[in-house]
Amino acid sequence: MNQTELLESLKCASEGMVKAMTSTTMKLNFVFIATVIFLSFYFAGLAIQALLRNNIFSNSTRHILIVCLLNSIVHQAVTLETRIHQVYRSFVYSSEPCRLLFHFTECEVELYFYYLTNYFSTYAVFSLTFDRLVSHYKPKYYFSHQYYVSNSLLIIQLLLSLSTYYVGLYGVPLVGYAPICYYTPRLAVNFSKINDFRTATMVFCIIVTIFIYYLSVKSEKQIHRTSYSPGERYIACENVATSQSVCILIVLQFACIMLSSFGVNYIRARESLMSEENFNKIAPFFPGVTYASLCLPLVIYFKTKLTIRNRKLRIGVMTSMYGDVGDHMNRLKKSWE
């Protein structure tokens, strides 16, 4: 019996798999993941409103963030749909182990959208990093060609996602069965290489973004010492704020993806030391991009609220001061030092 025939013969769930898929732990996991997803929908709406009405980012960065938010909504919707199907089967077919699992051909559409949006979400760090890179080193070009920059980066991000999907899933036979439709097809052999490449990309982007943030802070301090031009000071301040936000986003994205990657790899390495039931109870708690898709709108929304509040406080302090123009300018100079 070859590998394909062996996988096709495993139609019925084992006793451990049945216990895991119909357990209270699995149902609680569904409630937890569904809560994360609905919170991400809510905050994605708030974040998009903030970007459209109270934008604190450059137009290029805003464009990238809006596209990434829309992608995260699609990803979360697909994840929720797969989990609803799984929990439905756990109730309806709890006593029929041969109908509990999904054949991978039933999951073809979910796999396509789940992994494509997953990769697009991961490579958002590339677009955001190079957006900051161009902004810092070519500011005049950046501010006069913002939509060209963002569209170019988004196209590269999409090409990276499609290429990764092609290497990982394209042409892989959809044979065998899975308890949840976003599980990796059994004959997909390049996933470890893909995870290594994604990890290397994110580490590189974190290093570059932290470096750009350091340069932005250094540049802002220098401008504050040498220039009283409101325009220069504003641009420098906005560069620091945006670089800081992007840095936070990338670090959180990395943390969520690594939680998923290392978490699943860790329990897989110890799969022989634990029962099949326990393994399948723990694995669904590690959908890293699901958590990252909640972190993205949270950072955008609360960073926007915080920045607006700080601006109002600063304006309130400046407008509440009394004295002649000379006194006012002296106070401004002192506050900018």
Swiss-Prot record:
GO biological process: sensory perception of chemical stimulus
Superkingdom classification of source: Eukaryota
Keyword Transmembrane helix set for record: yes
GO terms, molecular function: G protein-coupled receptor activity
One Pfam family in the UniProt entry: 7TM_GPCR_Sra
Entry GO CC: membrane
InterPro entries cross-referenced by the UniProt entry: 7TM_GPCR_serpentine_rcpt_Sra
Chain segments annotated as transmembrane: 28-48, 110-130, 155-175, 197-217, 247-267, 282-302
Annotated membrane topology: Multi-pass membrane protein
Record's keyword terms, sorted: Membrane, Transmembrane, Transmembrane helix
Family of the protein in this entry: Belongs to the nematode receptor-like protein sra family.
Name the UniProt record assigns to this protein: Serpentine receptor class alpha-17
